Amino acid sequence: MAVFEGTFTQTEPLRLAVVIGRFNDLVTTKLLAGCQDCLKRHGVDPDPHGNQVDYVWVPGSFEVPLVARQLALTHRYDAIICLGAVIRGQTPHFDYVSAEVSKGIAAASFQTGVPVIFGILTVDTMQQALERAGIKANHGWDYAMNALEMASLMRQLRSNVTDSYSQTQSLPAAFPNASIGKLTAESEEV
């Protein structure tokens, strides 16, 4: 048996995408700054003109899952970080948006095999959002750490699975259309 655990130092450069909701940008820009600080301190060049991190701005948190899934389907990224802020108001809108964004981000990850990190603050007040985006702590940092760890872990798991299959020279019968190391259109469940 083996034990697998992601690390925060990469031997190979990572390729990441960050999807940011523009709505509540007072909060989301602070989350992004925390995310970039973490990446830089862990050896990832966060420069948007560099070759390691792509940034995609969308109107709000509700649009984040669709874009994250589209990026994940390209299989160009080791992980995708989703940043946004949904703040409760006087109507049930908060409940609908929060639930669908959460489901959508999880589905994007499950359907593609790419870690898609849930970095959407769901809070009752703007004060709570600001506290989580830099006044008390910056969760943008935490979301970047999650992405680094999951990208590392998935690389380890893919490598181990590929090595195991190459030793037996065949894929399990349960996955007749699958290929080693990448998801094919025939094996993808949508």
Swiss-Prot record:
Pfam families found in the cross-reference section: DMRL_synthase
Catalytic activity, as annotated: (2S)-2-hydroxy-3-oxobutyl phosphate + 5-amino-6-(D-ribitylamino)uracil = 6,7-dimethyl-8-(1-D-ribityl)lumazine + phosphate + 2 H2O + H(+)
CC annotations in GO: cytosol; riboflavin synthase complex
GO MF entries: 6,7-dimethyl-8-ribityllumazine synthase activity
Binding site for (2S)-2-hydroxy-3-oxobutyl phosphate: 90-91, 132
Keyword Hydrolase: no
Keywords: Riboflavin biosynthesis, Transferase
Annotated pathway: Cofactor biosynthesis; riboflavin biosynthesis; riboflavin from 2-hydroxy-3-oxobutyl phosphate and 5-amino-6-(D-ribitylamino)uracil: step 1/2
EC number: 2.5.1.78
Binding site for 5-amino-6-(D-ribitylamino)uracil: 23, 61-63, 85-87, 118
SUPFAM superfamilies found in the cross-reference section: Lumazine synthase
One annotated GO biological process: riboflavin biosynthetic process
EC supergroup of this enzyme: transferase
Reported function: Catalyzes the formation of 6,7-dimethyl-8-ribityllumazine by condensation of 5-amino-6-(D-ribitylamino)uracil with 3,4-dihydroxy-2-butanone 4-phosphate. This is the penultimate step in the biosynthesis of riboflavin.
PANTHER family the UniProt entry points to: 6,7-DIMETHYL-8-RIBITYLLUMAZINE SYNTHASE, 6,7-DIMETHYL-8-RIBITYLLUMAZINE SYNTHASE DMRL SYNTHASE LUMAZINE SYNTHASE
Similarity section: Belongs to the DMRL synthase family.
Protein name according to UniProt: 6,7-dimethyl-8-ribityllumazine synthase
